[in-house]
Each structure stands twice: as C-alpha cells, then as structure tokens.
C-alpha cells in the first residue's frame, strides 16, 4: 500500500505542473500571434488574397469530384 500511495501523489504533482505551464505558454502565443497578424495585413494584403483564392478553388474542385464519382 505504501508504494501505491507514493506513486499516486507523484502523478498528481506532475499533472498540476503541466497544467500551469500549458496555460502560461498559450497566453504568450496568443498575444504574439495577434501582433504579427496585424503587421502582416498592412504590408501584404494583395498577395495574400490572390494566393488564398487560388488555393481554395483547387481544394473545393477536388472535393466535389470525389463526392460525385
């Protein structure tokens, strides 16, 4: 019983530490992503739109063909 209790307490502490780290990392990524997105939109607006349109058209055509056949 002593061994079981020890392993149980160990796993609990590990789980708590992982949870806290994940939260802090997610918050940092969110802020950085928003800042980078705003900067990119101002500079490369035309190129982005053209690239996205072509990519979307190709994707949808492939999906429709698969469904019909």
Swiss-Prot record:
UniProt keywords, alphabetically: Chromosome, Developmental protein, Differentiation, DNA condensation, DNA-binding, Nucleosome core, Nucleus, Spermatogenesis
Example of a GO biological process term: sperm DNA condensation
Keyword Cell inner membrane: no
Compartmental location: Nucleus; Chromosome
Expression sites (tissue/organ): Testis.
Alphabetical list of InterPro entries matching this protein: Protamine_P1 (IPR000221)
Gene Ontology molecular functions: DNA binding
Stretch list, region Disordered: 1-69
GO cellular component term of the entry, any: nucleus
Purpose of the protein: Protamines substitute for histones in the chromatin of sperm during the haploid phase of spermatogenesis. They compact sperm DNA into a highly condensed, stable and inactive complex.
Family in the record: Belongs to the protamine P1 family.
Name of the protein in question: Sperm protamine P1
Organism listed in the record: Pseudochirops cupreus (Coppery ringtail)
